[in-house]
């Protein structure tokens, strides 16, 4: 391949579709990469549809070789709220994909650095999305494991390129665990759940659809997210518009047997913790192949969502208010969810990425048969 690489900024909706399409082309037929839903990608990247653009700005770039072939893509993002909250001047890079050519990866990263520097930024960091609800990190371990729709998958050579590019260094790692659903709820969870119910008057709460939508409980779930995650790596508080978007996108579609709350009977049944799971769409999305729900893809997704045609469940979010962590509220969540997992015949649970320094969360898995099987990394560089 000729190393004459041109970087083209995306300025049209047609260009954005081309930007999105490149990922499908690069990973077509891959055994472990999972095609993302196209409408999710478009809604996230479209400034008119993503509420994060109230405090973010972005520019998307394509890399084109001398034969006019698209050979890479990258998004440059500035999250002004996160920068203000953490007192940083960071430009983020995300949606990074490229062929195995150092000239391409270098040109893409330079484009983001130049764009960020022109806007007063002094550090480049990524892969990151607009917010912490987007996919984060470069896959550096677990290339032989099926991915999920919630995390990045990339070829092993990405890591080689990033670490050979001048001055990029590790900023943060996330670990992911695969957990065998036990045939019986572990005694640790069962006994702790019984104890904290009687000692602290904490109880499992199963939501109704109305509670989560018009009743406002869905908003309370994400208010707990804001409180629980506020001190984690580069987290910024979700806005009301973002919360409404996530309630409509995820909570309204959830199987409520797989959503568990914990309420405090001594505080007027205040919601103090929650866990949200979804059946895994991994195999369904692999069958669809191109990320399109129409004309037939929707049926494959529906079979998973409504009839649980999968052996794996994705544990998307867990949140416990700080003052209830030492009271064991998480034991109530797991005791209930494990029961629901067995009922649906799930054999495996995929825990979403956890910071490697978050040993408190990781310690939960010691009571279950689990394996840390993937690792994602975020890099940073002064510019």
PLM features per residue range, with description:
Residues 2-5, 152-232:
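Acyltransferase donor/substrate-recognition loop-hinge adjacent to the catalytic core
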Residues 125, 178, 261, 276, ...:
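Short beta-strand segments
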């Amino acid at each position: 391949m000729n190393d004459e690489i041109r970087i083209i900024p995306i300025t049209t909706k047609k260009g954005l579709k081309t930007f999105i399409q490149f990922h499908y082309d690069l990973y077509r037929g891959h055994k472990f990469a999972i095609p993302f839903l196209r409408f999710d990608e478009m809604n996230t990247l479209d400034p008119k549809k993503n509420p994060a653009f109230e405090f973010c700005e972005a520019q998307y770039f394509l890399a084109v070789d001398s034969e006019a072939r698209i050979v890479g893509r990258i998004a440059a993002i500035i999250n002004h709220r996160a920068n203000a909250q953490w007192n940083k001047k960071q430009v983020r890079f995300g949606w990074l994909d490229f062929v195995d050519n150092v000239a391409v990866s270098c040109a893409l990263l330079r484009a983001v650095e130049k764009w960020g520097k022109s806007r007063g930024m002094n550090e480049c960091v990524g892969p990151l999305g607009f917010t912490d609800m987007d996919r984060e990190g470069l896959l550096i371990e677990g290339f032989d494991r099926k991915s999920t729709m919630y995390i990045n998958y990339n070829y092993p050579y990405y890591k080689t390129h990033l670490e050979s590019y001048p001055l990029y260094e590790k900023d943060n790692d996330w670990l992911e665990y695969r957990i065998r659903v036990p045939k019986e709820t572990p005694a640790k969870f069962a006994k702790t759940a019984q104890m904290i119910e009687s000692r602290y008057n904490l109880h499992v709460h199963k939501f109704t659809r109305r509670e989560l939508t018009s009743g406002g409980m869905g908003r309370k779930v994400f208010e707990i997210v804001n409180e629980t995650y506020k001190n984690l790596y580069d987290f910024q508080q979700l806005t009301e518009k973002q919360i409404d978007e996530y309630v409509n996108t995820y909570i309204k579609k959830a199987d409520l047997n797989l959503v568990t709350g914990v309420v405090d009977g001594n505080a007027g049944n205040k919601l103090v913790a929650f866990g949200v799971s979804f059946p895994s769409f991994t195999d369904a999305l692999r069958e669809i192949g191109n990320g399109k729900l129409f004309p037939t893809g929707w049926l494959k997704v529906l079979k998973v969502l409504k009839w649980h045609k999968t052996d794996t469940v994705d544990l998307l979010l867990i949140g416990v208010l700080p003052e209830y962590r030492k009271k064991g509220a998480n034991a109530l969540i797991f005791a209930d969810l494990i029961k629901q997992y067995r009922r649906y015949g799930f054999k495996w649970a995929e825990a979403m990425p956890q910071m490697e320094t978050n040993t408190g969360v990781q310690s939960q898995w010691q009571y279950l048969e689990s394996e840390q099987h993937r690792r994602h990394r975020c890099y940073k560089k002064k510019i």
